A protein has these predicted regions:
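Domain-level signature for proteins that mediate thiol-based redox and metal-cofactor handling
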Residues: 1-96
Length: 96
């Protein structure tokens, strides 16, 4: 089972944002996840990893992830066969 780590900046007060994203991932992926960890950091960090592989980094990716984009990136690593329902359909409507 996958381990997700969300490292967030305590100085920036991003705990609420990090915990909401953790809740969304747990609600979506449930027992496909072994752990979702919140890791306090500093210096404007907001990084999300799946089993040590970075799937989002605030500075490199230009801000915070839209939750549907984050779910797709996590899904691609954790359960590629999973249909995310409206998240996948909404994305295909915008690209097609």
């Amino acid at each position: 089972m996958a381990r997700i780590a969300i490292e967030y900046c305590t100085q920036c007060r991003w705990l609420l944002r990090a915990s909401w994203m953790a809740q969304e991932l747990l609600s979506t992926f449930g027992t496909d996840l072994g752990e979702v960890a919140l890791i306090p950091g500093t210096g404007g960090v907001f990084r999300i990893t799946v089993d040590g592989d970075q799937v989002w980094e605030r500075k490199a990716d230009g801000g915070f992830p839209d939750i549907s984009v984050l779910k797709q990136r996590v899904r691609d690593r954790v359960a590629p066969e999973r249909d995310l329902g409206h998240v996948d359909r909404r994305d295909s409507e915008h690209t097609g």
